[in-house]
């Protein structure tokens, strides 16, 4: 273990960086950003039109979606007025009621479908302040399902978790946490972004910090999981709270998840800079004390629902086109790009379709799934409960990776559907399709709700968005707010989706169910077959968080 030497070396490294910076004043403005993906660099595929579309419905969908879009207005209402949508929470219920009311305004039938129960939790306010050796407000975010401080401030000295290697070591350390606030993860040695380190730091400094960070992270990796009852044991031993920090590669950006179920212990994510300060103060025995206030309410197991909107098919009501996007989120901020953008895309697409194409041939469904963040539970329950939809599915179109315009799609498990998707795109305006590249077949996947259809062998398509560095900047972070949405791209995606749905609904032929052979994915030597759907979790009894 190199904890104390780490911080001694860090001071030396910081001095080197400071001296280097002092020798280079006025280095100049930041480099001008360049649009790396305005258009793909390869030649446009044959499905990108060189002339205007001729289908009158396509033209009307374009006009309605691009000139009278409601996407930005809907997103602002959801994200600013309602906010995050934790599975089973009162705020999720409020957001789902908003969905029902808004669809009613559109003239669209929508309903809640219960698929199980989940432990419900209500968020209140939360604060933390350093009180010694100086006074400072701390940047904190109470984790979902956190315990509370019973309506009052609670104060304690700050200690660092012992990086124990056995239950016996943990038990020996446990009495020391009484009345304490426990730091339970490794800090970052620097909260500067990697781009700054690469541009400004000396190579020796960068290599040294990288090595020290790897060692420090390895020391504390998984320390709260080595004993399954870590949080409840720490609470029983009299700890005031647990602090953790999950830095996400940008200053001020942390990933925020949930605290373990039934721990009933106040748990906080702390900003990178403040967490590092607390860790250094504790390790250097400089007497840090913190007081916290956490308001929350555990409401027990409550019913959980998907919201399903529907336009009944006029001639093929037992065949379906599904618009798919999960509606639940974590609570670091508002859940904007994960996945309000996907939800609003599908909602706005259905509004456009209802306005322009109110009598589709096939039945159109929108699935606003709950429980995705806990394991595709809402969509998995829907496909298990509705075999008629799985059997009659023409296509499901799923969107769940951020705000950017759609730039990729593919046939999933069914290679013969690739030309079909290309044929659909050949009827759309090039303003939409010029950005899109059609991929080859892929596996079942597990990262989003299209997997809940694919695992049954049904044709489900992912609509892949331009990154905007989604994985680091907004995915599950405390900065996933309305301002991160690119409304022009949202408008673009909703219009594109409406056209896909219209063309899939009117397709004279059924989509292919011929599977790629072998199905990609899995362990070496593993043969994947369908159906291969796991059993969705319909309650929280086996869920850790």
Q: Which residue stretches match the model-derived regions?
A:
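Bacterial N-terminal signal peptides
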Residues: 5-16
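Noncatalytic luminal/extracellular "stalk/propeptide" segments of secretory-pathway proteins
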Residues: 26-56, 76, 80-213
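N-terminal capping segment at the start of a domain
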Residues: 49-89, 115, 125, 249, ...
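Soluble metallo-hydrolase cores and metallopeptidase-like ectodomains found primarily
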Residues: 55-57, 132-139, 145-171, 257-336, ...
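Second-shell loop/turn segments in exported
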Residues: 58-66, 80-91, 156-164, 170-172, ...
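Short helix-loop-beta-strand segments that form the rim/entrance of peptidase-like active sites
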Residues: 73, 262, 351-377
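Metal-dependent peptidase/peptidase-like ectodomains
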Residues: 133-137, 151, 156, 161, ...
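His/Asp/Glu-rich mid-to-C-terminal helical/loop segments that flank catalytic regions of hydrolases
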Residues: 266-270, 280, 351, 470-545
């Amino acid at each position: 273990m190199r904890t104390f030497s780490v911080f001694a070396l860090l001071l030396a490294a910081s001095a080197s960086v400071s001296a280097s910076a002092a020798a280079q004043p006025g280095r100049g403005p930041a480099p001008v950003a360049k649009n790396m993906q305005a258009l793909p660099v390869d030649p446009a595929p044959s499905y990108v039109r060189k002339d205007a579309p001729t289908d009158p419905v396509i033209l009307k969908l374009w006009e309605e979606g691009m000139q009278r879009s409601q996407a930005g207005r809907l997103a602002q209402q959801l994200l600013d007025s309602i906010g995050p949508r934790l599975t089973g929470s009162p705020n999720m219920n409020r957001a789902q009621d908003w969905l029902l009311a808004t669809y009613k305004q559109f003239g669209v039938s929508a309903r809640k479908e219960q698929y199980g129960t989940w432990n419900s939790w209500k968020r209140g306010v939360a604060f933390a302040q350093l009180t010694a050796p100086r006074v400072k407000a701390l940047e904190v975010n109470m984790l979902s399902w956190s315990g509370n401080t019973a309506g009052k401030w609670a104060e304690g000295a700050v200690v660092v978790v012992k990086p124990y290697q056995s239950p016996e070591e943990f038990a020996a350390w446990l009495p020391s946490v009484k009345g304490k606030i426990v730091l339970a993860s490794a800090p970052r040695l620097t909260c500067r972004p990697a781009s700054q380190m690469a541009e400004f730091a000396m190579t020796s400094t960068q290599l040294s910090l990288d090595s020290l960070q790897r060692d420090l992270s390895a020391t504390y990796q998984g320390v709260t999981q080595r004993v399954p009852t870590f949080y409840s044991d720490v609470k029983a031993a009299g700890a005031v709270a647990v602090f953790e920090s999950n830095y996400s590669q940008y200053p001020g950006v942390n990933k925020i998840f949930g605290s373990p179920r039934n721990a009933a212990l106040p748990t906080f994510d702390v900003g990178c800079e403040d967490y590092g300060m607390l860790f250094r103060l504790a390790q250097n025995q400089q007497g840090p004390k913190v007081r916290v206030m956490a308001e929350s309410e555990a409401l027990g197991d409550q019913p959980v629902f998907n919201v399903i909107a529907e336009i009944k098919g006029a001639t093929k009501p037992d065949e379906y086109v599904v618009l798919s996007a999960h509606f639940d989120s974590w609570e670091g901020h508002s859940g904007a790009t994960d996945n309000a953008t996907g939800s609003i895309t599908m909602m706005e697409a259905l509004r456009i379709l209802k306005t322009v194409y109110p009598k589709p041939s096939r039945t159109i469904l929108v699935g606003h799934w709950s429980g995705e963040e806990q394991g595709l539970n809402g969509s998995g329950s829907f496909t298990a409960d509705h075999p008629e939809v799985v059997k009659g599915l023409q296509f499901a179109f799923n969107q769940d990776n951020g705000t950017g315009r759609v730039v990729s799609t593919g046939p999933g498990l069914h290679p013969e559907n690739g030309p079909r998707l290309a044929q659909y795109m050949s009827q759309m305006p090039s303003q939409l399709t010029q950005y899109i590249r059609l991929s080859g077949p892929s596996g079942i996947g597990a990262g989003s709700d299209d997997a809940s259809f694919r695992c049954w062998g049904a044709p489900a398509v992912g609509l892949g968005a331009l990154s905007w560095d989604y994985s680091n900047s907004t995915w599950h972070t405390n900065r996933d707010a309305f301002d991160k949405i690119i409304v022009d791209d949202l408008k673009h995606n909703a219009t594109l989706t409406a056209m896909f749905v219209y063309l899939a609904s009117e397709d004279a032929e059924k989509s292919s169910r011929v599977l790629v052979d072998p199905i990609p994915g899995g362990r070496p030597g593993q043969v994947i077959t369908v159906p291969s759907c796991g059993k969705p979790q319909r309650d929280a009894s086996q869920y850790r968080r």
